[in-house]
């Protein structure tokens, strides 16, 4: 009994903590979010909309609060996105669990949820629930993502095979990302700066390697300059090292560089040996030999057109002197990260001075376009024009701001965007296997058949495009065979308004007063629990009697993989109708992956779609724990768009948006979004799994024990008594 009470108490305590964190971050969510002012114990003032920075700035005493923030930080280090959504989603999940165990009614839960709640309270423990959450993540979530949500995905690539970034799609993605992290007066400028940076750094064959390099060395690739307006931020071709030249000699023509990780000046003896001097003459002779050897090495470097010496260690004065004599510039004391970045760009190994000097050619050299000092706000930097041997074209970002704190916020936002794009460029293997039993090879477990027939797009002839959908089929559990099927969609055709009503999956529906969501007859088809939805939303709908006119707002799709090429500023649209491919005979197994570059329009589309399909899955489940977990997660997902639309009224409010989305899904019509921008599906998926893992940790806490400790006394070692 004590263990059960302690476990229930942990959920209640976690809910109280999460609600406090939710109150902090929810006010700065979305484009309408405000900035939060925090005062750190050091007296430093933080004004930010960045959820990760706000959570890390808090002084937390409760152990569960610290654990939640640690989970958020771990998630951000990997994905760079979703700190505020993490807290909101976790809070709604805890509310759902707490409501079930306390037999509290939730207006968004189905009628038989109390029956399942009593079953769980009598027969289950919290650790069993945590195991059910993990089972949901590994066996149910991935299947729903692959079987259902994948049909709605758009791609950020203009070419599916080469994975070439589409600039307009990247602009929409970055603008939506920075909208919630940077002030309103700067987010568009920072978004455009980031977009320009990538297209200047990437070649036509660039891939995920560029994002990995920029993410790993973002600190070395950006320079912060205080005392200037944000608008002075710019991109500089080449690499800017935050060091000054130890020795600078202007040079033109053929320039080469070497990298050294040890001193060039020879030592008296090698490691592990002993050098004995018996007289001053021997000492002077040894010094003369070292000087001549150093002089010969530097002269030989000059003969090989080496004009730049990059060193990770401090070089002796003798090396600097002979470098200047031979016209060689020296940059020393570089960090290991800076040296690693240069080596990754030019593919150069460090130069090791030979023990026995020879006049042979030095192999470890690289060409340099230019080498000159750069002055930014009275501070000198080293500006290098490196010739890249990889897909990354060296460019540096100069971030300006009136104060250092604002520059740090922009740096964090840019670095987070890099992590988000790095994850977006990866394929995601979905961890589920589903058996196919029907004649068409579709899974009887995950496939939900709508009452209406699937709409088949008319063939536009040569203008049609295709989206590859990668699947792997394992027949008889032995051989794996990769197959590729295609979903045909329209090309970027200009369709008159009269024809838009015919091409339903690719046009925005026009709603007249006869088909608005004001009558009970229409509301009855909007949800699985139609009576509940009618009662819940009818008072809200009566306040608005105008029809919704959304004619002419659409996403035009072109190229080979559902690339978003043009989205009007008034709205955007998702294609929803498709037909699952024929995957072979029965008793075969299907394993799939989510391709890189999958995106969805912003505005809660991912959460509403997953909510809708989870409710459909829960309705067909036969196991109570799967039904309960699906219902809790489905209802918690709606908490995110609720916060996004809390400032909207009328037809743009959350109830109207939700009802329109459900109606569109049930009638095979496109989903219409009132907001512009794109968001990463990979980031949303990783956020969902990270929150479920955090919730699992919370549910395994049996007891929270508070231990009060007195502050330790600090003794001054240099007190007067000791002196």
From Swiss-Prot:
Q: Name one GO molecular function term.
A: ATP binding
Q: Where in the cell is it found?
A: Cell projection, Cilium
Q: How changing residue 308 to F affects the protein? A: In BBS10; has moderately reduced ability to interact with BBS7 and BBS9
Name the UniProt key words of this record, in alphabetical order. Answer: ATP-binding, Bardet-Biedl syndrome, Cell projection, Chaperone, Ciliopathy, Disease variant, Intellectual disability, Nucleotide-binding, Obesity, Sensory transduction, Vision
- Known consequence of changing residue 296 to T? Found in a patient with Bardet-Biedl syndrome; uncertain significance; the patient is compound heterozygote for mutations in BBS1
Q: Which InterPro entries match?
A: BBS10, Cpn60/GroEL/TCP-1, GroEL-like_apical_dom_sf, GROEL-like_equatorial_sf, TCP-1-like_intermed_sf
Q: Name its GO BP terms in alphabetical order.
A: chaperone-mediated protein complex assembly; cone retinal bipolar cell differentiation; negative regulation of neuron apoptotic process; neuronal action potential; non-motile cilium assembly; photoreceptor cell maintenance; protein localization; regulation of protein-containing complex assembly
Predominant localisation class: other
Result, substituting residue 91 to W: In BBS10; has moderately reduced ability to interact with BBS7 and BBS9
Q: Which Gene Ontology cellular component annotation is one that this UniProt entry carries?
A: cilium
**What's the effect of swapping residue 677 to V?**
In BBS10; has moderately reduced ability to interact with BBS7 and BBS9
The protein's matches in Gene3D superfamilies, at most eight in alphabetical order, are given as: GroEL, GroEL-like equatorial domain, TCP-1-like chaperonin intermediate domain
Which superkingdom, per the lineage? Eukaryota
The outcome of changing residue 49 to W is: In BBS10; has moderately reduced ability to interact with BBS7 and BBS9
What effect on the protein does mutating residue 81 to N have, as reported in its record? Greatly decreases all interactions with BBS7, BBS9 and BBS12 indicating that this residue may be required for overall protein conformation rather than required for ATP binding and substrate folding
Q: What further fact does the record state? A: Adipocytes derived from BBS-patients' dermal fibroblasts in culture exhibit higher propensity for fat accumulation when compared to controls. This strongly suggests that a peripheral primary dysfunction of adipogenesis participates in the pathogenesis of obesity in BBS.
User: What does it do?
Assistant: Probable molecular chaperone that assists the folding of proteins upon ATP hydrolysis. Plays a role in the assembly of BBSome, a complex involved in ciliogenesis regulating transports vesicles to the cilia. Involved in adipogenic differentiation.
| Entry's family note | Belongs to the TCP-1 chaperonin family.
Q: How is the quaternary structure described?
A: Component of a complex composed at least of MKKS, BBS10, BBS12, TCP1, CCT2, CCT3, CCT4, CCT5 and CCT8.
Q: Which disease is it linked to?
A: Bardet-Biedl syndrome 10: A syndrome characterized by usually severe pigmentary retinopathy, early-onset obesity, polydactyly, hypogenitalism, renal malformation and intellectual disability. Secondary features include diabetes mellitus, hypertension and congenital heart disease. Bardet-Biedl syndrome inheritance is autosomal recessive, but three mutated alleles (two at one locus, and a third at a second locus) may be required for clinical manifestation of some forms of the disease.
Name of the protein this chain belongs to? BBSome complex assembly protein BBS10
Annotated organism of origin? Homo sapiens
């Amino acid at each position: 009994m004590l263990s059960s009470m302690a476990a229930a108490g942990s959920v209640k305590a976690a809910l109280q903590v999460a609600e406090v964190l939710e109150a902090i971050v929810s006010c700065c969510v979305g484009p309408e979010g405000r900035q939060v002012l925090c005062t750190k114990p050091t007296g430093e003032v933080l004004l930010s909309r960045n959820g990760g920075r706000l959570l890390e700035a808090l002084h937390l005493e409760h152990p569960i609060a610290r654990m939640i923030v640690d989970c958020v930080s771990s998630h951000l280090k990997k994905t760079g996105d979703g700190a505020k959504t993490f807290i909101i989603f976790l809070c709604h999940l805890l509310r759902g669990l707490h409501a079930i165990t306390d037999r509290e009614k939730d207006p968004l839960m189905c009628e038989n949820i109390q029956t399942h709640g009593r079953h769980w309270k009598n027969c289950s423990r919290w650790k069993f629930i945590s195991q059910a959450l993990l089972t949901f993540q590994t066996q149910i979530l991935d299947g729903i993502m692959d079987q259902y949500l994948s049909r709605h995905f758009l791609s950020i690539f203009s070419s599916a095979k080469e994975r070439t970034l589409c600039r307009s799609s990247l602009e929409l993605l970055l603008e939506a990302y920075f909208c919630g992290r940077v002030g309103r007066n700067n987010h568009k400028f920072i978004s455009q700066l980031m977009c320009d940076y990538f297209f200047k750094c990437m070649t036509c064959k660039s891939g995920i390697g560029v994002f990995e390099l920029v993410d790993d060395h973002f600190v070395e690739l950006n320079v912060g300059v205080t005392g200037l307006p944000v608008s002075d931020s710019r991109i500089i071709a080449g690499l800017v090292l935050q060091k000054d030249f130890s020795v600078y000699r202007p040079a033109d023509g053929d320039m080469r560089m070497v990298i050294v990780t040890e001193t060039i000046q020879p030592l008296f003896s090698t490691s592990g040996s002993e050098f004995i001097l018996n007289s001053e003459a021997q000492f002077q002779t040894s010094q003369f030999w070292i000087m001549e050897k150093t002089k010969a090495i530097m002269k030989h470097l000059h003969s090989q057109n080496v004009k730049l010496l990059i060193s990770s260690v401090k070089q002796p004065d003798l090396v600097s002197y002979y470098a200047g004599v031979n016209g060689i510039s020296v940059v020393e004391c570089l960090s290991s990260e800076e040296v690693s970045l240069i080596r990754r760009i030019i593919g150069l190994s460090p130069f090791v001075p030979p023990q026995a000097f020879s006049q042979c050619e030095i192999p470890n050299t690289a060409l340099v376009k230019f080498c000159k000092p750069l002055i930014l706000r009275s501070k000198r930097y080293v500006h290098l024009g490196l010739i890249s041997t990889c897909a990354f074209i060296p460019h540096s970002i100069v971030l300006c701001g009136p104060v250092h704190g604002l520059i740090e916020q922009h740096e964090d936002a840019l670095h987070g965007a890099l992590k988000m794009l790095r994850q977006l460029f990866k394929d995601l293997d979905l961890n589920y296997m589903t058996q196919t039993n029907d004649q068409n090879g579709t899974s009887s477990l995950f496939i939900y058949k709508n009452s209406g027939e699937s709409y088949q797009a008319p063939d536009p002839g040569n203008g049609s495009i295709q989206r590859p959908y990668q699947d792997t089929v394992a027949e008889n559990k032995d051989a794996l065979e990769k197959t590729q099927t295609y979903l045909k969609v329209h090309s970027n055709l200009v369709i008159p308004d009269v024809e838009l009503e015919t091409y339903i999956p690719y046009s925005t529906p026009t709603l007249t007063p006869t088909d608005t969501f004001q009558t009970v007859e229409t509301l009855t088809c909007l949800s699985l629990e139609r009576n509940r939805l009618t009662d819940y939303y009818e008072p809200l709908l009566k306040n608005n009697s105008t029809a919704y006119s959304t004619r002419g707002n659409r996403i035009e799709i072109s190229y080979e993989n559902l690339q978003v090429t043009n989205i009007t500023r008034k709205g955007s649209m998702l294609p929803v109708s498709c037909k699952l491919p024929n995957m072979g005979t029965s008793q075969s197994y299907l394993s799939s992956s989510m391709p890189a570059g999958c995106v969805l329009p912003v505005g809660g589309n991912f959460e509403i779609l997953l909510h809708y399909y989870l409710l459909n899955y829960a309705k067909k489940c036969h196991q109570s724990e799967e039904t309960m977990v699906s219902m809790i997660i489905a209802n918690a997902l709606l908490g995110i768009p609720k916060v996004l639309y809390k400032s909207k009224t009328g037809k743009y409010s959350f109830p109207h948006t939700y009802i329109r989305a459900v109606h569109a899904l049930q009638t095979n019509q496109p989903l219409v979004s009132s907001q512009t921008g794109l968001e990463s599906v990979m980031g949303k998926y990783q956020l969902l799994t990270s929150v479920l893992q955090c919730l699992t940790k919370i549910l395994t806490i049996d007891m929270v024990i508070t231990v009060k400790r007195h502050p330790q006394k600090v003794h001054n070692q240099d007190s007067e008594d000791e002196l």
